[in-house]
Amino acid sequence: MSENLEKTYNPKAIEAKLYEKWCDNKYFHAEVDRSKKPFTTVMPPPNITGKLHMGHALDNTLQDILIRYKRMQGYNALWQPGTDHASIATEVKIIETLKKQGIDKHDLGREGFLEKAWEWKKEYGGRIIEQLKKLGSSCDWDRERFTMDEGCNKAVTEVFCKMHEKGWIYKGSRIVNWCPVCNTSISDAEVEYEEQAGHFWHIKYPLIEDDGSVSTTKFIEFATTRPETMLGDTAVAVNPDDDRYKDLIGKKLLLPIVNRELPVIADSYVDMEFGTGVVKITPAHDPNDFEVGKRHNLPEINILNDDATINKNGGKFEGMDRYAARDAIVKELDEMGLLVRIEDYSHNVGTHDRCKTTIEPMIKQQWFVKMDELIKPAVEAVKNGEIELIPKRMEKTYFNWTDNIRDWCISRQLWWGHRIPAYYCDECGEIVVAREMPKVCPKCGCTHFTQDPDTLDTWFSSALWPFSTLGWPEQTEDLKYFYPTDVLVTGYDIIFFWVIRMIFSGYEQMGERPFKTVLFHGLVRDSQGRKMSKSLGNGIDPLEIIDKYGADALRLTLITGNAPGNDMRFYYERVESSRNFANKIWNASRFIMMNMTEDFDIPSTGINPQELQLAIADKWILSKFNRLVKEVTDNMDSFELGIAVQKVYDFIWDEFCDWYIEMVKPRLYNSDDRENKTAALWTLKSVLINALKLLHPYMPFITEEIFCTLQSEEESIMISKWPEYQTAWNFEREEKGIELIKEAVRGIRNVRTKMNVAPGKKASVYVVTDNQELKQALEDGRLVFASLACASEVILQQDKTGITDDMVSVVILNATIYMPFAELVDIRQEIERLEKEEKRLSGELARVNGMLNNERFMSKAPEAKVAEEREKLVKYSQMMEQVKERLAQLRK
């Protein structure tokens, strides 16, 4: 072979050029081809604000593994890429950029701001795509989409209008999660709950007597974590079955400070066992109170402005921040004698996942999706197995959300995003939902309209991603061929945001499931198990890892040991281990190529392996590999990607490199038998090429470079055929025989290590056994056994003829192996060495015992130091025992 690999593996030298080659040759591209079976997956579109992080790296590596695997299996594999406009995240980022330039969003106006936003998107929006390419992602970049491109915009408008026509979308006043910093509503899924130390304020409201006077002795007591919301109270509720309060139902209380009369109502929502069994009802600021208020026709009094200051309904507290108002109200209640006590209390507080501001439940006019009917097909699909969630335990999380679903608030008070296609008649206020600006008001005939200023929740457009990217609402050939998709790979943290919404959108718009399987992965945490975050400063930049170790090392690290749905810890040591594995493959490949001289340049095709003189070692490795192909393929088909690559890793490192290559070296170096050498080289090359194919989805760059250097028949490993299991390549007898030989070799190596035998020092090996299977294996593999065991000769016998007392022995399986002691070591030199070691250990033991028996040391030294010295005592004692035992043997 005239061409060989560079002496050392350098990822920087190969990765960029190989990726360019793949793109130039359109290996990632998929077109409709009815002669092939399609396999489709859509990329969870990363935000255009995004920079590649470890979560992206894991998510896209998993997808790339699946798409490369299916491509090699002959599927017409499409991985649909794209980016998300990320409404609120992008708007916040652009506002920050403008602030640095001294520009205020509102000074620009909506159109001016959107111009800046598109400029920003053009400059920075594609950054993460270039970073994904560095990872090796084999997406069809010719099909790259954006959630606000023309096609997606059309799909969003069509869905909104269709759902409004069906009554699924409506505008109404309901409780929403309001972010007072971002000044927008957010969905339940965008609220993060974190435990915070707070208080329960125990307050009492006085009873209004039948004559209208306010009682000074009769009160109803309750507790609240948000005393400022009392300004919006419109009732106090008790459970209808609570005997303590039955006489008070229908009575009136006086709301202190505000001096508003509140009815005492009965509602089963109230838990009699919690606190005093009394709940104040604030319909405009609590979702549960809102529902109670609807049942009892209570007024809804909003006390907050959009920035969470008190509005005019708060009377004298108007203009105060919510927390300042809280303090002032509590102070006044205390002065009035109506504050019973303050109790420390830890509770979950909802915060906006973007800006971490405490959200305010607030009644607002918003657009909603009615979920009660829409969600039913999504529930049934998972229940009946039409859509499979992996791991299965994710079903519990899925159903927990669907069982407690609320109507989805889809309007956002933002400018960047899909503007809601609703138009208000300037004359009569009639709302017209339409695919384009209406010409005439159907109610009054006016021709002037103003479009709703709000935009849609980012996840509204993302929910359409599996079919909008294929051309819907047009019935394109792509849509007919590639939809429904096969698998969705995503993090478990967006099951609510995205997965469920895609499922019900798929059934509602397409009448079928959007995908067959959802493969969930966990989070990538730091080595201590902590979530990576800016505040902790523990984030790890995958691009830095790629720059230092190569993309393949990062990919292998992220997948090895990874199980669906489980979080993983990231260790730099594991990346180094992955890099070492790459070096191992590289060096093994170079070794094989160096032995393929012009006389022995083995072609990849044109040789009938059945005609080769395969030795026992050849048949063993071929049989082991054949079994590996079946197991790995089964694992891949079951989405056990971490298990699959661990098996490939173990096979290449252990069976192929550490054992088989060592087994065939005598045949390569010393054999004059051309046919024997040809069989060895063919086996080496064949197994390596096919092992590279199994590894390719995980480590695409190094496998491509070696594959294309090792053979010339195929232009790229990524479009080569995935190996298939063949029963003809099962060699059970030879496989078992080599395993017996390996066990015997391990025993011999252990003895040599204990005796400190110099590497390469040869000695006679006597194997005493009456086990015919072992004898046959050693006969068939005598050359292999002798080489691996450093045996000058191998003597097989059934009895102890010729065995002397000065031989060392080891019992392995059904055999005893003997080696002449004098052939292994120079006894005098070994005794001298061990006597020196005995003296050194004696000194160490004296020192450690002295410290541990020293009262001052034991009382003042840190616990860790004392523990360290105790560990040394155990270690040195064990070493001394071994040295003494060895000396006793030698002196005999």
Residue ranges and their predicted role:
Residues H56-L58, P287-V292, R501-Q509, V648:
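Alpha-helical support elements that line or immediately flank enzyme active sites
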Residues E31-I94, T147, V156, F222-T224, ...:
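N-terminal catalytic cores of NTP/NDP-binding nucleotidyl/phosphoryl-transfer enzymes
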Residues R34-K36, P44-P45, Q80-E91, E144-C152, ...:
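Short, solvent-exposed turn/loop segments enriched in Gly/Ser/Thr/Pro and often Arg
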Residues I203-Y205, G250-I257:
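Short conserved beta-strand and strand-loop elements enriched in small hydrophobics
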Residues R68-N76, T97-R110, E130, K134-C139, ...:
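Secondary-structure transition/capping motifs at alpha-helix termini
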Residues M1-M54, A77, V340-E343, D353, ...:
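Non-catalytic terminal extensions that flank enzyme cores
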Residues H202, N400-F460, L464, E508-A551, ...:
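Feature 926 captures the class I aminoacyl-tRNA synthetase adenylation module centered on the KMSKS loop
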Residues E3, K17, K21-N25, I95-S215, ...:
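Residue patterns forming the tRNA-binding/recognition surfaces of aminoacyl-tRNA synthetases
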